[in-house]
Amino acid sequence: MIIKPRVRGFICVTTHPVGCEANVKEQIDYVTSHGPIANGPKKVLVIGASTGYGLAARISAAFGSGADTLGVFFERAGSETKPGTAGWYNSAAFEKFAAEKGLYARSINGDAFSDKVKQVTIDTIKQDLGKVDLVVYSLAAPRRTHPKTGETISSTLKPVGKAVTFRGLDTDKEVIREVSLEPATQEEIDGTVAVMGGEDWQMWIDALDEAGVLADGAKTTAFTYLGEQITHDIYWNGSIGEAKKDLDKKVLSIRDKLAAHGGDARVSVLKAVVTQASSAIPMMPLYLSLLFKVMKETGTHEGCIEQVYGLLKDSLYGATPHVDEEGRLRADYKELDPQVQDKVVAMWDKVTNENLYEMTDFAGYKTEFLRLFGFEIAGVDYDADVNPDVKIPGIIDTTV
């Protein structure tokens, strides 16, 4: 079938398998052209491995450090008449390119919050890898079924303690509009912490440790975003921020557990990028459109692969890591450069419907958004007939 982008709200409901493969290849080429990661990981588990930062971590470990990788994700395969999810095609492409390099790559499809998927992962590590020396936690999910209670909990994107009104960008209608959000209830805050906080990361590390599949010296990191003043009301000081603060608490006990075997645990702070998750946050499209313009002008613009490759090379496995006073690894320092933030803040209230394309890089934002789904990739013929039924040879599908 011939597949064209169809966007509804902050989701593109179609995906392009050839475009997704080309996007993965571009990221691999970036890593291989920038050289190996010295003393990098060799056997890596990535939880949330199919898109965005998790996919970039899997690519960086495999092609920057020659690592065998096991990826966990929750994606949907395509059929002859309907495309699958982008994460499915990304993972199929990753496994194909890893196999060409002689690297081990297997994937587990299922609910990473569940005990079942944790057990299947442990069994696969024991059978295929023995032990892992890096665990990357990169889950973004709107809800979680708690494995112990069976309760399904939802996360909420709301301010805490006060209603907030801010400028946003309606990406469908391409207009600037005021957005007002009522404060989260305590139940909504607790739910967001349960879905997006550190409990599941801790459950993973506890399960892996008890099963004896963490190598001596094993490291783990969970990805987070802090942002700057302009996003704080809705992000760091909001319900999501409460979940992110929970990561900062949970990492301490995880670090103690791994330190007993010479290992380490860190929260890693990454810059704002276009992802399916960030495009759902009302103020992020406008912030990102301004940020892209400023960072491209200063030559510091980065996407997922540049961020995560740099994180592994400089901080997780580098001699002089970028660490803040909380002990987090920082890869967001170019975004938080005061000169960059001052320019974004200065333009924030000046953007109008009429000057949107001149004052911001909304065009670049839209391109990055479509690239998530395999569109707008250079060299791909989007008028060609493609088969959306793409297999992942090494898949262990717990959903069937």
Curated annotation (Swiss-Prot):
Pfam family, one: Eno-Rase_NADH_b
An example Gene Ontology biological process: fatty acid biosynthetic process
Domain of life the protein comes from: Bacteria
Keywords on record: Fatty acid biosynthesis, Fatty acid metabolism, Lipid biosynthesis, Lipid metabolism, NAD, Oxidoreductase
EC number: 1.3.1.9
NAD found in the keyword field: yes
Annotated substrate binding sites: 225
Gene3D superfamilies found in the cross-reference section: NAD(P)-binding Rossmann-like Domain
Pathway it works in: Lipid metabolism; fatty acid biosynthesis
UniProt cross-references to InterPro entries, sorted A to Z: Eno_Rdtase_FAD-bd_dom, Enoyl-CoA_Rdtase_cat_dom, FabV-like_NADH_b, Trans-2-enoyl-CoA_reductase
Record: residues binding NAD(+): 48-53, 74-75, 111-112, 139-140, 244, 273-275
Site-annotated residues for Plays an important role in discriminating NADH against NADPH: 75
Stored PANTHER family: ENOYL-[ACYL-CARRIER-PROTEIN] REDUCTASE [NADH] (PTHR37480:SF1)
Assembly and oligomerization: Monomer.
Protein name according to UniProt: Enoyl-[acyl-carrier-protein] reductase [NADH]
Organism: Burkholderia cenocepacia (strain HI2424)
Lineage: Bacteria, Pseudomonadati, Pseudomonadota, Betaproteobacteria, Burkholderiales
